[in-house]
């Protein structure tokens, strides 16, 4: 899909954000499957029900941010599903953003809004929005 490639090329840091069960992972995997670039899927949420294209490398275990940095150097598009499982702070997110920007890569991060919060009227959303090049919100 040419439109998705264009969106992925123009945005270094993309957040897919929403409450649990709002198809965030489906959107991220669809973006990955639509590109022919070297890509990887960091599947921290143990999603086994998705059909991932054979050319996409899947990692199910990640120990720390250094592994993500290595993925950024090795792949053009990196999908992390979902970031809260790594307990990465905002300074580390900014560091990752700078790295993908400098290397002209795309990092797609799935982030979950707590079910007891409003989708966009919370501090977590505001923090992510300030550093994202693109926010994709899901709400049903």
Task: Give each language-model segment a name.
Residues 1-7:
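N-terminal pre-Walker A segment at the start of P-loop NTPase domains
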Residues 8-9, 34-35, 70-73, 98-104, ...:
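Conserved catalytic network of the ASCE P-loop NTPase/AAA+ motor domain
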Residues 8-70:
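Conserved P-loop
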Residues 15, 77-81, 108:
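Structural motif
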Residues 45-48, 84-86, 113-118:
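Conserved nucleotide-binding/hydrolysis micro-motifs of P-loop NTPases
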Residues 71-89:
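Conserved P-loop NTPase "ATPase switch" module shared by AAA+ and STAND
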Residues 90-117, 129:
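Substrate-engagement module of ASCE P-loop NTPases
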Residues 112-140:
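Phosphate-binding/switch region of NTP-binding enzymes
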């Amino acid at each position: 899909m040419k439109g998705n490639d264009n969106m992925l090329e123009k945005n270094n840091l993309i957040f897919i954000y929403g409450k649990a069960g709002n198809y965030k992972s489906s959107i991220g995997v669809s973006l990955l499957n639509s590109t022919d670039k070297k890509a990887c899927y960091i599947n921290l949420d143990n999603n086994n029900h998705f059909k991932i294209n054979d050319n996409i490398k899947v990692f199910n275990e990640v120990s720390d941010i250094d592994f993500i940095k290595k993925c950024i150097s090795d792949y053009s598009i990196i999908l992390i599903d979902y970031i809260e499982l790594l307990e990465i702070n905002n300074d580390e997110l900014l560091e990752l953003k700078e790295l993908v920007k400098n290397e002209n890569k795309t990092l797609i991060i799935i982030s979950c809004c707590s079910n007891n919060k409003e989708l966009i009227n919370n501090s977590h959303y505001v923090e992510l929005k300030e550093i994202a090049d693109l926010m994709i919100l899901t709400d049903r």
